[in-house]
From Swiss-Prot:
Oligomer and partners: Part of the Tic complex.
Keyword annotations from UniProtKB, A to Z: Chloroplast, Membrane, Plastid, Plastid inner membrane, Protein transport, Transmembrane, Transmembrane helix, Transport
GO cellular component, one term: chloroplast inner membrane
BP term (GO), one: protein transport
Source organism phylogeny: Eukaryota, Viridiplantae, Streptophyta, Zygnematophyceae, Zygnematophycidae
Primary residence: plastid
Protein name: Protein TIC 214
Function (record text): Involved in protein precursor import into chloroplasts. May be part of an intermediate translocation complex acting as a protein-conducting channel at the inner envelope.
Transmembrane spans: 23-43, 71-91, 96-116, 145-165, 179-199, 226-246
Similarity-based family: Belongs to the TIC214 family.
InterPro entries, alphabetized: TIC214 (IPR008896)
Compartments, record wording: Plastid, Chloroplast inner membrane
Amino acid sequence: MITIAPMLFSVLRAYDLACINTAGPLIILGIYYGFLITLPIAPSQLVCIRAFLLEGEGKESESPGTVAKSGILIAAISGLTVSQLAFFLSIYWPPLYMIWLKPHLLTLLVLPYMFFYWSRIQEFESSGWLKTEQSKIYDPRVRAAFLDSFLFQALNPVLLPSPVMTRLMSVFLFRYSQVSLFILGTAIGWLGGQIMFVLLSWCLLLRLERDLPTIYVIVRRLVHNIFPPIVFGLCLAYMGRAPVSFFRKQTDIQQMPEIRPTELWPSVAFDTTLWKRPFRLPKKDMLDNFPPLYNNKKRFSQYLFEVCVSEGKRRLSYTYPQSLLAFQSHLEDCLDVTYVSQQTDNDIYHEWATSKQNRKDQISNILLKQMEALDNGAPIETVIENKIASLTTIEQPVRKRLDPRLAKYMRYNTLSNKTESPWIQGESSVLEDTSLELQSKPNLFHLTENNYLREWISIKSEQMINTLILPWQSLEHDSDAALLTLLNNSPETNINKEQLYTWESLLHAYKLNPKVDIYKTMPGHKKLLYYLTKQPVTKLLTQIFHMDQRVDSSDIKTLLDYYKPLPVWYAQRHFTTTDIRQPRISKRLKSFDFVRRLITGSLRARRRNTLIWNALQIKPETPFLLRVHNVSKQEDMSIKQAISVTTQQTNLYASETAKRFNFRLAHMVRSPALVIQSWFRKYVKQPILILFKNVGRLLLLQKTEWSEDIGDWAREVYIYYSYDGKQYSITERPKKWYYTGLQIRILFPFHLRPWHPSNATADGKDKINLQLQSDFDLVNNNNSILEHSSYLTVWGSETEVAFGNVKKKPSFWKPTFKAIRLVLSRKLNKQFVKIGNMFQPVYKLVQTPLSSKFVNQTMFAQEEPSVSDNMKHNTIEQPINSIDNKNLFFLNHNKDNKATKNVLSIEKSSLILSDNRASQDSLVLSSDSNKLYTNEHKLENTSKQLLVIKSEHTKPLQQPIMLFRIKPILEANTIIKHSLIGRPPMQTNQKSVDNFQVQLLSKESSISIRYKLTQFNSLLVQFQRTWIYIKQNIQNIIVELFKFIQLQFTETRMTILHLIQQLMQLVSSQVITGFRTISSGIDHLFDSYYIWRMKHFTAKHLQNVYETTPIDSSSITQAYILNKIWQSIIESTPNLSWVTQQWTSENRLQDYLQTQLVDQGILNCQEPNKLTQANWNKWLEFFPQYIPSSNIWLNVIPNRYRSEVNLYWKYCDNIDYKNKHPIVSINAHNKIQQSNGLRYHTPLLQKLEKLSKRWKMYNLYRRYTSFVNNINTNRFPTEPILSNELNQLNYVNENIVHNSVNKTEETISYREPIEWGFTRTRLGRFSPYLTLSQSHSNNSIDDIDTEDIETLGLFAILQTYKEFNKKTNFTSSSVDHKLHKQESSAAPKIDHKLDSQLVSTNLIQRTCFEPMYASKLKSKLLKERFKNLLNAARLSILATKSGVTTDTTTFLSSNMQRDLSILTEDLNTHKDINEGIEISEETKQDAYSKAMRNSVLFKQNLQNWRLKIMDDQIFMYNMVSPILRLSNREHNDYILNLCNCLLGELSSNLVESIVALTPEDILLPTSSRELRVLDCLDLTAGPNDYQSVSNNTLIQNKTNSIAVTDQILQNKSKLSYSNFVSNIQQKSKPSYIIKRFLWPTYRLEDLACMNRFWLSSGNQSRFSALRISMYPSMLE
């Protein structure tokens, strides 16, 4: 018992330690989380601290034990702990947890309580803490403290969430909610944290009371004053976060639903602008680290399960869209639609199978119709499906969205508004459409004939000015045209342009044919679309989605703003400019950043990490991949706005600049700068300008404008916009504006009023200033707000649009400059007047000689008969008016002659008095004239008066002054006579009267002379002005004439140079064409000679070996199809860029392609839009883009390859044949030896076994890829540079053929499959272009070149190539030994030729691709062991040759001795191979070395490692590596020259024949893939029939292979290839059979490829290289 007790204790101790090790981390983790919960300061902790300070009894600071005696403190702490405990326990009760996370119910209770609590704590009771009695449990203060702490803690997770508590909740929910140890540790930590909180609160109270005893009451009051604002802020924050529903005002304003294009169900229920994958959100840029703009949880739930239909089966989707489910529930309430859950599995499956079968029939019918059109003589380019849309005219260039030379991002997508005629055969005819079922085009048979009438109509329509759209041309509608058609073609009678349309009617504008009963023909899932077009259902949908809001049709831009079309790259550039100062504007597609941010807790999407950067895809595309690209059928719906070219350039420049600076770093610099600039402009810059202006006016004694400027300054408003132009607010900025960008728009921008003089006079004479001021106010009041707005820039300037040109401001000093010019001109005019007054003395000198002349004129005037008063008035009124209007300047400035003024004034007054009817008007005229005279010196600074004065000074006087007719007037009134001289007459006699008249006439003569001088000055001024004007015109004419002559000379020179260039190009092209024709003829002669020579040598040795395969052979292998695809890539589709790099003058392919490109105008195109449709069609017709048909493949079918493969496996599987050889016993012995003595080399032997497996597979597929074993291959011409090598190889082939003819069944050894194709690897450089015969050599594995074996890392042989040649005819049979003796005489010649072949063979092996051998040894230890084995092998050879035995090798190490002993034992087991054969000693040594090489160490039972399925990676490597290894220039030229020959032969023989075209090639790749997948499906089987067609195909293929194998075994004695082929052909049917022994259809990988093609996604896996074309047999 005593001895058992320690053992028992030790067991219990171990159990305890194990429990501690497992439970310890959980408990510690729980304590950690529970303790951290109490650390963050929350509102509940603040309430408890307030209870400590204000609600206690005043003795808490003495000891911690007194806290337990205070009921208020206990209630506060209890409320805190109970609330936290309830929150934790809510995890196990979901309703309580939902109440806490969605506290809408608690909102009604908590908010009023918080308001009451806030009002209650406003009062402060300073004596409350002095109470000595203990608080009872029924004390209201105790209950209030408990409720306060409880409710504030309940609000803590919602109002102020703690990250520690959130983390703890996540841990509870997802990890350790059922682990009791973790819960226990959390409880312990939580209790510890609460106790620590109480102790820390007590320490705080103690510290305050002891350190500040005098101001303790002040601290309490301060705490009381701080706490109410905190509670009130928390209350407001809670109301803003979780508002009550009845507090919010229910507005009747409904948001306008978004208009979407017409889509199918269920896509119509989705928002086309959002991501449909729930976990993928777009990211703006790489520097954007804040959360995305759209919250994905509002639109899609992470997991929503719903039943759906997929591939004819009912499935459960876990990512079913929630919006689709809600829409479906609404439809089920108002429509009688059969739901998925109500249908049976059979109905769903049959409906799906029927749709797929119909689709299959549709594509098949289209294919048959197109083939019938080809049979009727229709050209291929009109029947084959292409991606180039048909155009109306030949001269119209190809649009850039259809140009195949451009990348995809340069082409824009168009919506499905494009309607095609049945005459056009495009991709849309193959794609499935739900609104209009696809028809089989019955008229295609007739339309594909030669329709000369259609061609004649097309040619005539192109010559017309107003070209009409013909029925066989495509129709393209713009968005605005479609909407105008919808408005104009309304069925209502009383319609006007202001008619209102609902959004719902525009959304569901479907057009169906009412004559066809579509409801009966369409499937079930399409019937919903039929229901949506009916009016009652439309009304129901309007009521459901509240789509009854109306929109005005006149404002069509509002409707189109809902669409977000991509920008269009037009074919012609209308906005090109030659100004190098401006950046080149080019519209590009908006590129999106596909870097996704995953939501926390979501799963990562299963997709490959492919590189999708758009910047790396900007490359021109080759025209050879034209038919692979898909062009969408959507059209852009942008409206063509009629704006000027300058405005478009400005907008394009602004948009490009905005895109250029749309990144986060630029926003962080630009946005604060804009805000600072707006503040500086508003409060610093503009007030300073107003101050300086008015102070300057005050100093210049002008009227100030404080009120006007301040009013304009106050009108200026700043509006904050987001970076994309969305208006946000006037007072607030957008959220995170410093990250996302900001724009500031200014309404009514402030500008200083122009400087103008004030209204100093009170009579209101400054009318111009008032008019200018009124015009300025009128402009400010009448212009709209948008016209009076601008955008603020960082530098403080203003622009019309964001990032646009700087807006021009009104000039402040412009009126001032005008006034200065006016004053200067007035001063100059006064100076000219003074100069005119200097000529007054000249007038006095001529007064006396002219007195007699004036007297005679006066007497003559008295003798004239009197006239009536009216005639006097009429004759005198005109001179007076002329004086008033024409001579104002002269009369006004003649200050010396005052008498003249009085005479004129009295004269005018007498004339006015004589006519009573015009008295008033004349007085007004006189007053106006006097005013003009008096105000002449007070001219104002107005532009109108300035122009008048200038014209008066410079314009000549046209009418003379009639002063000589004054005498009749003087006789009529004597008073007027006395008044004319200014005084009464002193004498009344006749003499005094005559003197008076003489004086008067002398004054009149002086006036007339002065007038003539003035007229002369005016004429002089006019002449000067006229001369200046004529001189300027002559200069302008000379300049324009010189420019015109220079321009004409330049154009003429350019035209001549262009003509010379074209002439030189024409001459050079003709010369080059002639030389090319001559050179091509010479090359053709050489090629024909070498072709004849090759045929002669090959036919000479092959006529007794095989017979040619008949044309009606019906077996096609998949391996050969893959090979022909690989071959067609090299032959017919070279890379255009690579061809241009390897361009040489000796190249036939260059001449062949360049001539066509130059003739068609493609090579010399400077811009892509110059490529016309006709040229492109010719280019497509010329280039051989096709896959050879099965009829052509029959001529080159490798039947010998299949037969040899069958023979290979037959002998490998022949048990009787294996039993005849001692290799079985050798293997058994080797296994024993390996288990005993070779255990040290076990890893190396395992590596050797893997290498042997790989080597055997390499032999098999290398026989195929080398292509030297196909005797039926068409012979293609080769180049002269290879003649020497071909002659040498021909000799080798003769020997091989000679050996193969004398070959019998007994000579076939078990080693032959291993050596198969080994000696032909040197000829791989010429495959598959050379035609070399198939042969079976007698050589064993010993005859293989050691370099090839050494590449696999098996062993190294030290023999030379000459020693190897001596053993070429050595065999293991006596018959072969005799043949060797007979041919020994011819050995020197053969050796000489083989020696000459050594150099060329080595050169060929250098350039040939290396085989795919095994990887290096994994460790250095294996490498050292491998070296030891090689050393042992060499020592064994040396010991055998020198006669040294194993006993004398004592100087070697123990390991090497052991290796030599094992080699000796292994070689002794092979001695029975050569028994019974008499050979020389040298031959024995060679046999010994061969036997050593065949030992178990280097060839571990190769026959037992058979693999009948090739490795796809190795196969693909050997298919592609010959193309990749052609790196040197010689091989490139060689392949290019071969392409010339092949291209010439194919283009001359095969392109013109329809048989050369595969029927499947008529369809597009998408349609052909869909047809292949549909053809593989068994749509007639039931839903429960799980026996697929692939299994039947597998059984059938196995049966066929077994039958063929039996046939080979039965004809074992007849091994000739011709007999074998003839037997197979007799039993074969004329139908075509595709045997898939490499990649059959029942393989799982093949089905995976089908699924990828079915989803129309890019397949980048390895299986895409092994896909082959399936097509029906067309020739029977």
